[in-house]
């Protein structure tokens, strides 16, 4: 949504696969009305995820894996001063006056964007956590072996997503410490 970057964070993905960004977003913006004709309601701010998977299935994004998304994250352009701002803010509270009061500063990205691309970006090392949208590569099949890790492959399903309302839930979880202490409910 252009909070930390002058471009949509998916731009390096579109550039890598020679996808016209304007056409992609135009298609995405038309999807709610398109699916409404079939009686299906889609989330406006996250339906782009399913459309990315349509591009993968159509062969327009060959070889798109979570690892590839992470690689492409290195190409996300940030506004001037980002990521330096993160370390400057941390340094500003690394003073005895703040430490004696146990004041801590944590940085999180809460986004409808792609977690793997953020993990591969220049800001990842400055973050305490990333909340966003993720893909499954090889889905578990009926009767899958629970003792083994999932296999790798092309992204094929949406694992989870944040939309503009669930971002608020993520903020409450961070505030409460659920991300640090899973036993907290």
Predicted stretch roles:
Residues 122, 130-185:
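Conserved acidic, metal-coordinating active-site core of Asp-based
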Residues 1-145:
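Alpha-helical substrate-recognition element adjacent to the catalytic core
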């Amino acid at each position: 949504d252009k909070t930390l970057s002058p471009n949509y964070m998916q731009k390096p993905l579109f550039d890598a696969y020679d996808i016209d960004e304007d056409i992609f977003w135009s298609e995405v913006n038309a999807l709610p009305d398109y699916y409404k004709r079939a009686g299906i309601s889609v989330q406006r701010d996250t339906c782009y995820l399913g459309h990315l998977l349509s591009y993968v299935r159509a062969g327009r994004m060959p070889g798109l894996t979570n690892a590839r998304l992470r690689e492409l994250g290195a190409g996300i352009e940030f506004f001037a001063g980002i990521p330096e701002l993160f370390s400057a803010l941390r340094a500003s509270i690394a003073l005895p006056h703040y430490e004696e009061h146990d004041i801590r500063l944590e940085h999180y990205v809460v986004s409808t964007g792609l977690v793997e691309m953020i993990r591969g970006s220049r800001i990842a090392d400055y973050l305490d956590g990333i909340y966003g949208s993720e893909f499954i590569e090889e889905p578990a099949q009926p009767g899958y072996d629970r003792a083994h890790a999932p296999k790798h492959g092309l992204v094929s399903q949406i694992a989870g997503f944040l939309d503009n309302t669930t971002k608020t839930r993520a903020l409450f979880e961070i505030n409460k410490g659920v991300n640090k202490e899973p036993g907290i409910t």
